[in-house]
A protein has these predicted regions:
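Active-site-proximal or metal-binding-adjacent scaffold patches in catalytic folds
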Residues: 1-60, 69-103
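Walker B catalytic acidic pair
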Residues: 65
Length: 103
């Protein structure tokens, strides 16, 4: 897991810099119902199981949480920004929900 964790840490840093997002801390946790979360203090938590997802879905989850550093809800503004960055946020989100279910 250490190798994958290093990759994901670098990926979060790379995507944050590329799109101009700032976050406070990054943690990996065991989460039963979510792939990630972003706190009011812009701490990003990623589910440890993210390592088993395809890279494009990893990027989507990371970007989803990075967008939450600016927009704390799932408003049209949120989906608009995420869609602008990912190209197809709603489609990727649907793919994630349908094919990779957390129990």
């Amino acid at each position: 897991f250490i190798h994958e964790e290093e990759y994901l840490i670098n990926r979060v840093e790379t995507l944050a810099k590329k799109y101009g997002f700032e976050y406070n801390k990054l943690k990996f946790k065991v989460m039963k119902t979510r792939w990630g979360s972003c706190t009011a203090k812009n701490n990003i938590n990623l589910n440890m199981l993210i390592i088993y997802l395809p890279k494009r879905l990893q990027d989507y989850i990371i970007l989803h949480e990075l967008v939450h550093t600016r927009i704390k809800d799932h408003s049209h503004r949120f989906w608009g920004l995420l869609g602008k960055i990912t190209g197809d946020a709603k489609g990727i989100h649907k793919d994630l929900k349908e094919k990779y279910i957390l129990i």
